Amino acid sequence: VGAGTEAKADTQKQPFMRLNHGLHLAYCTNIHRGETWRETFDSLNSHTLAVRERVCPKKPFAIGLRLSNRAARELSEPAALLEFQRWLAQKDCYVFTINGFPFGLFHGARVKEQVYLPDWTSPERLAYTNLLFELLAKLLPAGVEGSVSTLPGSFKAFHLNPDAVKIVRNNLWRCIERIAHLSEQTGRKLHLGLEPEPLCLLESSGETIHFFDRLRAEHPRDPRLAEHLGVNYDTCHFAVNFEEPQNALPCLRHHGIKISKIHVSSALKVRPTAEARCALAAFADDVYFHQVVIRRPDGQRIIYPDLDEALASEPYEAQDTSFENLPEWRIHFHIPLHTPTAPPFETTNDHLLAVLDLLAENPALCSHLEMETYTWEVLPPELKSRSVAEQLAAEYEWVLPRLAERGLASP
């Protein structure tokens, strides 16, 4: 759903809606399998067009494209790129953002820590990201900014020493130089967004600010940093980390950090009753990391790299502990935005809505919104819609009225 385009917020109740303030809204296609370009293109034809038909059948439809390294290289072939450009024009779709976090396989096998490889110490990560920007510059409609999101440097468990972190900064700066050159060459406004995530090199607003301060000290008074590197603010990740958007977002902006994109996403939160722990087992899969951040009533925080480890290691609370005195668990599991809350589960949608409140107060904060619920294949059956297209349409039907309530969309 793009700026000035329309979408059906709810086919039964809501009229078409138009996004305001130059906003662009899409779902991220990393929910679909597709490691080759042909597989990715097939998913656009079979799934994305089905979503478009339900949500926005008669106006331009925005796509948040996920490309693996292999798919990006295959799409860069002139014939493939021309075919895709023609397809976008024919189907009245457009790409404004690319998810460049997962480099390789992202579905159907163990991903876990592999999603962080190659990290930003690697020339492969730099070359891949540069290629994504070269493709995006050729796909963007006139007058639309382009963003690519990427991993926040590396994963803490890889134990990067200071020299390795310096390599991360150096490679990111090389990417900034390439983005700046492309922007000047093409007249496009392009920016890269680091996506903080629990247990990564950057997992909090504080760590992110410190990292940018180091970059700024290494490249003093160079405007390219602020113009071309920022943060992809994933509302699931920041909520899992117990950050409050009223603090995190203004703090990032105060330190001159661009909000490149906002991932509209939601996490699980529970109080660990015996019932809740039993129910949580259904969310412990063999594909993705589901980091768990636990905050005790005294404010102490404990982080587990994965849900199964938290369930196995965290002691049970005494049976006579009152519900209010139980710790709170927040689980990095992207659940559908429209998921109804029912005991023992809650969601972090309150964090997401607070971000939308801030966006309504200052629409210039960010123009790129991307729903990212990539966990379709590993969702417990009771949370799945009948098809992935129906689930995605339901997410639009949840988001659009909430944008409208805040003046970010209108009939």
Q: What name fits each language-model region?
A:
Residues 73-77, 108, 158-160, 203-207, ...:
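A short acidic (Asp/Glu
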Residues 28-32, 66-70, 100-103, 151-155, ...:
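Active-site beta-loop-alpha junctions enriched in small/polar residues
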Residues 304-305, 309-409:
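Flexible, acidic glycine-rich loops studded with aromatic residues
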Residues 2-4:
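Residue-identity detector for glycine
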Residues 182-315, 326, 335:
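Acidic/histidine-rich catalytic cores of soluble enzymes
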Residues 109-230, 240:
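Active-site acidic/histidine proton-transfer and metal-coordination neighborhood
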Residues 13-143, 147, 174-177, 223-228, ...:
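N-terminal pre-domain/capping segments
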